[in-house]
Regions:
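A short, N-terminal "cap"/entry segment at the start of jelly-roll beta-barrel domains
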Residues: 1-29, 118-157
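Conserved short histidine dyad/triad with adjacent acidic residue
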Residues: 14-20, 33-49, 83
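A generic structural signal for short beta-strands and their flanking turns/coil linkers
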Residues: 28-33, 51-53, 60, 83-85, ...
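Short, conserved beta-strand element in jelly-roll/cupin
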Residues: 34-39, 47-65, 102-105
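Short acidic-glycine-tyrosine-enriched beta hairpin
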Residues: 54, 68-84
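Ligand-binding loop in jelly-roll beta-barrel domains
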Residues: 63, 75, 83-109
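A short beta-to-alpha transition loop/helix N-cap that caps and shapes the active-site region
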Residues: 107-113, 123
């Protein structure tokens, strides 16, 4: 058992902050992240992959871009992304958002694609040229830094 306010976080700068609950070794079958997004911050870049992912908004408002269409997500809204579904989540509204993200692992990076999406580009969450390489997709972003939990990232208990 761990307390999210006491474990290692990563500050990704313009892509928000997240806690993955893992130490030096990744969980082999399931990835789970607690993401904190300010308005306008994407959780990552618009993509599709061979694994399913699920997202639950715990606080705030987000913009979901799925298959090129924009939809609002509010507190307690859940989004299931089947394999090969193009998607990204962006913080929206006037306050920070907290999103729990869960995804299956074990299939490697095969099938990961960052396609071009006008909707995602409009929100700073897309690539200008399709790629299958995360290093190319995220090349213009600052390197992620290890961080301690910052007071106010998560809702009060």
């Amino acid at each position: 058992m761990v307390d999210a306010t006491e474990v290692r976080w990563r500050d990704t700068g313009s892509l928000g902050a997240f806690c993955d609950f893992e130490g030096k070794r990744r969980f082999p079958e399931l990835g789970i992240n607690l993401n904190v997004l300010q308005p306008g911050q994407p959780m990552g870049l618009y993509h599709r992959e061979n694994a399913q992912e699920d997202f639950l908004v715990l606080a705030g408002t987000c913009l979901l871009i799925v298959e090129g269409e924009e939809r609002e997500l509010k507190t307690w809204d859940f989004f299931h992304s089947p394999p090969q579904t193009e998607h990204v989540i962006v913080g929206a509204g006037t306050e920070r958002a907290v999103v729990l993200a869960v995804g299956s692992r074990g299939r490697g990076r095969k099938g990961l694609v960052y396609p071009v999406s006008e909707a995602a580009l409009k929100h700073g969450a897309g690539v200008e040229q399709e790629t299958t390489k995360p290093a190319d997709a995220y090349g213009s972003f600052a390197e992620w830094k290890r961080s301690l939990y910052q007071e106010g990232w998560l809702p009060d208990r």
